[in-house]
């Protein structure tokens, strides 16, 4: 990837505000997940370590639609929660970008207050709106909402732990 205003220059430090968006290649640098479990296609906004908006384009080609459900495909709610968690993980990784320190993993630790409001179907574009509630050392807590066309489809509170090996 060629350096641009949104990418860090090799060998330099990047502050949280410098990473404002991320295409799929940048998302793959931030997160360890890969197909079929990478559930964030793009980051359209990162505001320091306080909030982030991730995008997931849902297509019928995804493996979960083979069995969930063949005649009426619905994107599994647990994958909406995982997408929120991955978007939160992008906040953690983007915030800690420096030459010397970066978490090697961000582990999902807690999921609370989960509600599924409306089904998500192939053709939908999901926006994951994540907001940091607080953090203590390596533990971070977030409030998330998944929206399709501005309509709330799911919400959750998520706790994560950053691990540096």
UniProtKB/Swiss-Prot annotation:
<dbReference type="InterPro" id="IPR029069">
    <property type="entry name" value="HotDog_dom_sf"/>
</dbReference>
<dbReference type="Pfam" id="PF07977">
    <property type="entry name" value="FabA"/>
</dbReference>
<dbReference type="GO" id="GO:0006633">
    <property type="term" value="P:fatty acid biosynthetic process"/>
</dbReference>
<keyword id="KW-0443">Lipid metabolism</keyword>
<keyword id="KW-0441">Lipid A biosynthesis</keyword>
<comment type="function">
    <text>Involved in unsaturated fatty acids biosynthesis. Catalyzes the dehydration of short chain beta-hydroxyacyl-ACPs and long chain saturated and unsaturated beta-hydroxyacyl-ACPs.</text>
</comment>
<feature type="active site">
    <location>
        <position position="68"/>
    </location>
</feature>
<keyword id="KW-0456">Lyase</keyword>
<dbReference type="GO" id="GO:0019171">
    <property type="term" value="F:(3R)-hydroxyacyl-[acyl-carrier-protein] dehydratase activity"/>
</dbReference>
<keyword id="KW-0444">Lipid biosynthesis</keyword>
<dbReference type="GO" id="GO:0005737">
    <property type="term" value="C:cytoplasm"/>
</dbReference>
<dbReference type="GO" id="GO:0009245">
    <property type="term" value="P:lipid A biosynthetic process"/>
</dbReference>
<dbReference type="GO" id="GO:0016020">
    <property type="term" value="C:membrane"/>
</dbReference>
<keyword id="KW-0963">Cytoplasm</keyword>
<dbReference type="InterPro" id="IPR010084">
    <property type="entry name" value="FabZ"/>
</dbReference>
<comment type="similarity">
    <text>Belongs to the thioester dehydratase family. FabZ subfamily.</text>
</comment>
<dbReference type="InterPro" id="IPR013114">
    <property type="entry name" value="FabA_FabZ"/>
</dbReference>
<protein>
    <recommendedName>
        <fullName>3-hydroxyacyl-[acyl-carrier-protein] dehydratase FabZ</fullName>
        <ecNumber>4.2.1.59</ecNumber>
    </recommendedName>
</protein>
